[in-house]
Structure formats: structure tokens, C-alpha cells
Amino acid sequence: TASTKPLLVTMLILLATSAALCWQTMLGGLAGLINMRRGNTADTMPAMAAVASILQCIMFLAKPEWYNPATLCLMTGPAALLLCGNAAGKAIDAHTIRDNFTLVSAGMDHAVAYRLKDAGVLRTVTAGLAEPRPNVLVSRPTRLMKGFLAGSESRRTSDKNQQQFARILLGCGVAAFLFTLLYRKDAGTAFTALAGVLCLGAPLAGTLISAMPMRLMQRSAAQIGAVIPGWKDIRLLGRVNVLQVTAQDLFPKGCITLRGIKPVRKEDIELAIIYSASMLADVNTPLKDIFLGMTGDNRKLLCKVENLETLDGMGYVGWINGERVMIGSRRLMDTYDIQLPSMEYERRHTVNQRRVIYLAVSGKLFSMFQVAYQSDPDTAAVLDSLRRAGLSLIVDCDDFNCDEALLQTAYNLPVGTVKVLSGKEHKALEPAVAWLPESEGNMLHLGSFASFVGGLEAAAGAAEGEHRSSMVLSASVLISCILAMIMALAGGLAGLPLPALALYQVAWAVLAMIFPLIQRY
């Protein structure tokens, strides 16, 4: 009738404007429904609801006699609400990407974590672990992370699920339309039933269930200097079961202490300390803090070391004042035929996580140092969490004393879950962890153990939060489809009160959002 035409025109213009503002959602959603190659998307269900509601208004304008305001509800309001929910999720995503980009483009040296893909290196460094199908996450220092924007725009994990439900929802809508049209012989009610099914079944939180966990993950990870670009990276990090770490990660400063010095001649004790500190001063090893500490961190006391050579897993060889100086393990001394005390003597001094460091000068034993390794409480808690999550460790060792037995004892790690790389294995892995000016990766971090593991935990929290929300969303779509079909058969769908429909959608959205909000990141 003439009295309803202004209302229909107004509602049509408002919904069409909303759809135009969300044109990417409309285009992507409908294209995803028609062309499966375009990829999965969470835009299809709100786009279908908007199209059906626009079609409802157009049909009522074309056939005014079909529209009875007393018995039929216009679905333009719920459809616009669904588009707003979709846009809200995308706005949160945009803020997350912006904040991540600020961290990534800071121009600082970082490290990128990525999955080791070289099959040969992978077999070499994981041989001996109990993990049958190792997926190793390694880190390399870099200045720029490549592919950040592409990773940020990757498909959400829940998109595939929502795309499948979109087809189910459309089938229910078409079935309700045909039943109402053929059984009740009422075209106006049939178009209302179609729009009603799609507006009732489409989730308000379709993009929010991914955007909210990603946002909360970003905030948590940023506090420890970590950045995970997008859902593709979260999924890949979730498949990792082996982490590459260093001895410095496992034994931070203060965990290794000096328990005794036994020079061959007592008068050489000061020289033994200076020689040892000089040899380790410029080496990346947790042992150097002990010896530099004995000199009061006064580098003026140190001697110049020439031709310093690192022998992986054994120690260091260099020249001081024309004399060859060696500091390291028994194996290093045996390699150069240095006369040492008996193994029985060494065993008496290597109980309770203690180790002996030998210093030789000019081919003769000069001094012995006894050091003790203690577990770090924070590191122990992290390793226990990793163990319960099924993660193993490969230790790219920068401490010649560190071995599997020491780590298993210090941190109560099961046999087969930790491996210390040999010199050959270290060389095989070295190109994969060497510095590059720019590198692809799945996570950017500060290079510290806390930032590395904290980023992994944040990503795992986001994945778990989205998974639980996705289960709620799936239940909401299925229950809504069943309710919509029952109401369509009973003839009550066309007259569904709009406030009730809006509250129904909001209730499901709130329920879905609870899980990301209570999830630990």
C-alpha cells in the first residue's frame, strides 16, 4: 500500500548503503559461494542475508499487496546488524596488523622463527629424538621479516568451517522459501522466510571469533617483543614439535657458578684466571660470565688472544704471548695429548651437576676449574609446560660441558626429548640459523628464550581461543537452521519479532566471545 512504501524505500536505502560500505564483504562472500576456488571466507553468510533482505524489500515494492506489516517482518535491520558485526571483526584485524607492523618495522635487529624445511638437515639434527615426525622450529637473527603483510592477510582457521555452513544455511533458506511458496501459496511470506532463515542462521560473530583472539594474542606477544603475523603462521607454529634452543637459553646468568680452582702450581692461580677469562671474553658462551666475574669485569686485565679457534663440543684453542692456550673438556685435552688426572679423579668432582674445565698452556695442564649447573626456576616452569605440550628440544650448544645427561638431570627431562648437537650437526644447522638482512618466518621475536617461547604460547592461546569459539559458532548455525526450519513449517518465521531476533544473535555472539576473553595468551 502507499502508506508502507516510504518505509520500504527507507529500509532498502539504508541496507543498500550498508552493503555498499561493506562492498568487499558482499563481493568476497558471494564470490566464495559461487566460486570455491576463490577460497574460504567468513563473509558469505552475512552477504547472503543482506542480499535476501534487499530482495525482500524489492519484491514488496514491486508487489505492495504482498506486504502486510501486521504479519510480516522486514529483515533489513538484522541483515545490517550482521554486516556491522562482520565489519567490527575486520576493524579489529586492521588495528592488530597496524600495531604488528609498527613492531616489525622498528628497524631493530630481531630474530625470526621458521620451520626447518631442508630434509637432510632435519634428519641430521633430530636423529636420536623420540619424535617420529619432527617439525623443527629454528631462529635466525635478522633485521627485516619478509612476507609480513601476506601473512597478516592469510585465511582465518574458522573460515573453511563457516564457508561449509554457508551452503547448509542457503539450502535451508531455499527449502523454507519453496515450502512456503508451494504449500502456503504466499509469495510475500516465502521471501520473508528466505530472508528470515538467512538472518537467523548467519552468525553475528563470524569474523570476531578470529579477530578477538588475534588481538589479545598481539597484545600479549608485544609485551615480550614477539609478533605472529597471521593465522597461517599460527597454524604452522601449532604443528611444531621440536624447538631449537641454546645453552644460554637453558642456563641464564647466575645458573652456572664456580665451585673451585685447582691450579697445578698455587702461585699460578691469578694467571690461570686471567688466561681463562681472556680465552672466553669474546666467545658467545654462558661460561664467560664466571671468568670475567673473577676479574671484576675489568677487561684491562685480559691478555690479547690470537687465532682463537672454536672446537664444537670440546672447547677453545688460541695463542697468548706466543704460548698455545687451551680451555675445554677432557676430550679437547685428549685430542692434543695433554696429560690429565685419572677419570676416577674427575668423576669424584663431577657429581650433582658439576663439571670440570681444564686449562692447558704450552702443552701442559695449567689448572682445573670446577663449575656447578643449577636449574633456573622460570626456565624449569617453561620447559615443564613445553614437555606437557609434547615439545622436544635440540640444543645448539655454546657450552662444551653441556650434554643430554646434564639437561635431563637439571630439568627432569625425559630421555629422548632433548638432544645436544655435535660439532658436525652444529655445522649442518649453521646456515639455517645464520644472520640475514631479511628473512621469511612465522614469528618475529627479540632472540631471547622468553620472547621465543612466549610468542609460541601466545599463538597457542589464540588457536585454542578461536577453536572453542568456532565450536560455539558451529552450534549456533546448526541450532538456528533447525529452529528456522521448524518455524518455517509452523508458519511463525515470517512474523518473528525483530528485537527477539537481535537479542538471539547478540546472545550467541557473547557466548562465542567468552572463550577468547578467558583464554591465557
What are these regions (language model features)?
Residues 149, 158-159, 262-312, 334-336, ...:
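ATP-binding catalytic core of ATPases
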